[in-house]
UniProtKB/Swiss-Prot annotation:
One of its GO terms (molecular function) is IgE binding. It comes from Arachis hypogaea. This is Oleosin Ara h 15.0101. It holds the Pfam family Oleosin. Expressed in seeds (at protein level).
Length: 166
């Protein structure tokens, strides 16, 4: 049905045929879209865009490389002259910065630990408190077992002292 010309009531056929469009169902006033006709143009546009961007980036990278080399050429004599001062100063600054970062990290860890401990003592049940309670129970059970075994061994030792022959 879609390949036949529509005529009669409902329009379509008479409008398209009277203006040279062919009047087939689905046609757009006599023009048709063929995607294969636009492919070479589309590929050419893609290629031109990609090549333009690529050349721009290549030029920018060349300028950056040139600027870096010129900067090193200018800075090298200064670095050689001042290296007996700059190298120890850089090492000292790095050690000082590392020390400050380490002490700050220890301070933050101490504050976090004290905050957790305060929450635990006040009964707010912070994260991980259930594992601490479980570990406390396990340690108490083991301590009770050791105490019972010690009593058993002490009682067995007294019993052996009372028997003759030992």
């Amino acid at each position: 049905m879609s390949d036949q010309t529509r005529t009669g009531y409902g329009g379509g056929g008479s409008y398209g045929s009277s203006y040279g469009g062919g009047g087939t169902y689905g046609s757009s006033y006599g023009t048709s879209y063929d995607p294969s006709t636009n492919q070479p143009i589309r590929q050419a546009i893609k290629f031109m865009t990609a090549s333009t961007i690529g050349v721009s980036f290549l030029i920018l990278s060349g300028l950056i490389l040139t600027g870096t080399v010129i900067g090193l050429i200018i800075a090298t004599p200064l670095l050689v002259i001042f290296s007996p001062i700059l190298v120890p100063a850089a090492i000292t600054l790095a050690l000082a910065a590392g020390g400050f970062l380490f002490s700050g990290g220890c301070g933050v860890a101490a504050i976090a630990a004290l905050s957790w401990l305060y929450s635990y003592v006040t009964g707010k049940h912070p994260a991980g408190s259930d594992r601490l309670d479980y570990a406390k129970g396990v340690i108490a059970d083991k301590a009770r077992d050791v105490k019972d075994r010690a009593k058993d061994y002490a009682g067995a030792g007294r019993a052996q002292e009372g028997t003759p022959g030992y």
